[in-house]
Amino acid sequence: MPMRMRLSRDERRLRLLLAATEVFGEKGYRKTEVSEIVHRAGVTKPMLYRHFPGGKAEIYMEVLDDHLQSMMRKLGEAMAKAEAPLDALRRGIDAYLRFAEENPEAFHLLAETSAELDPGIVDRLKQVRTTIADGLAETIGAVLKEADLSDEGAPVYAHVLLGGVESVVAWWLETKLLERSAVVTYLLTLLWRGFEGLPRGGSRIRLELSRIIDLPRVAEAGS
């Protein structure tokens, strides 16, 4: 009978985190049992509690923070390559969709909205959404200012966009009816439709959008 290779402490911890990401992503926080995580990881329950004394809540928070940092890093890297605020918005949306496509379980973790979550986790998820919404508001505000428009409504647009994007991504991951680039185009076009109705500057935003997405194709599809 072959001997089982002994895992290092770091390897066991990583295995637990990967297993927890999968199980939480599939079943949600409340329906997940510690026994399912250790079974998926191939370790014992005492081993999980040795690494995470707080049990399910602690490992959930650890997984959440790991993926949050990864997502924010990828968003930041993508948006840093932009030459203008509107392009930064496009790159940010695309990076968010790419992250969800490559890490579906992590996306479902970050989009968790269960009313049965522990208060500490609810607070952390609120912080996550606030961080993302604040970044969106800053970028949208820059887009509006560049078009000589008031940025007062930027936080409103940001929260609408964030909620809409989360819903769209959940649908897209399940159906994959469109290419990622097409989803990004339609989301940006939806913003353009709204900005176009503003009293001043809408035409300038439309011009900038036409340089980074295929507006004629979208307009044709919507006619």
Residues covered by each model-derived region:
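N-terminal intrinsically disordered/low-complexity leader segments
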Residues: 1-11, 199-223
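Generic hydrophobic, amphipathic alpha-helix propensity
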Residues: 12-20, 37, 59, 63-71, ...
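Short, structured helix-loop boundary elements
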Residues: 13-14, 34, 57, 61, ...
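Helix-turn-helix
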Residues: 15, 23-58, 62
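Short coil/turn segments at alpha/beta junctions that flank glycine-rich nucleotide-binding fingerprints
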Residues: 26-30, 82, 103, 147
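Hydrophobic alpha-helical connector segments
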Residues: 62, 76-105, 161, 184
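Amphipathic alpha-helical packing segments from all-alpha helical-bundle domains
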Residues: 72, 119-145, 155-163, 182-185, ...
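Amphipathic alpha-helical segments used for helix-helix packing
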Residues: 87-88, 101-123, 137-141, 167-174, ...
